[in-house]
Amino acid sequence: MIYIIRHGQTDWNIEHRTQGQTDIALNKNGIEQAELITQKIANLKIDNIISSDLKRAYMTAQIINKKFNKTIETDKRLREFCFGTLEGITRDKITQEIWDDFNKNAKQFNAETKEEIFNRIKSFIDDIKSNNINKNTLVVTHGGPIRMIKYYLDNGDNFNDKKYLAEYMTLKINNLDIFIIDEKMNLKRYDL
């Protein structure tokens, strides 16, 4: 089984700032959230933990790992999407027109394209499928990669920008939501 958790809360989450790959730590509430989720998942059998290397995910993994006592492997492929020059800006300052421009040409914002993100997430999932057979793996990452993981598992190798934007970009993922990839490689919310 593969369990996937979104990191705990940051100040930028509260401020509705676009975080992207800006390295923001958990706030006090985020630390408490991670401690609470650790209690809720304490009965899971976890063989290994893989985390995004960004502070908010890694701190979440460290707090959870106090229960499981595993070596935390970091993987840059699990980083949040790079939003380039839009990082740090509050959502109310980013108009729909700016988002539309961003979705048409992310490079003009010094950001990753969705195809680049898809390829790194695909690479991660393919590696974890082949290298973690018969292991229960806990992955700590961000909302964007979780959406892209779902897209890849639902649609396979062919990335379609319009389909992703229409069907997956709006998937609501809260801090410390848990998902599971089952034996059939379907991503589902994990209810405790």
Model-predicted regions and their roles:
Residues 25, 66-123:
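Phosphate-handling substructures
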Residues 157-188:
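Domain-level recognition of soluble alpha/beta enzyme cores
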Residues 43-45, 128-135:
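Glycine-rich phosphate-binding loop signature in dinucleotide/nucleotide-binding domains
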Residues 143-147, 177:
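GST superfamily/GST-like fold recognition
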Residues 1-3, 48:
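Extreme N-terminal starter segment of soluble prokaryotic enzymes
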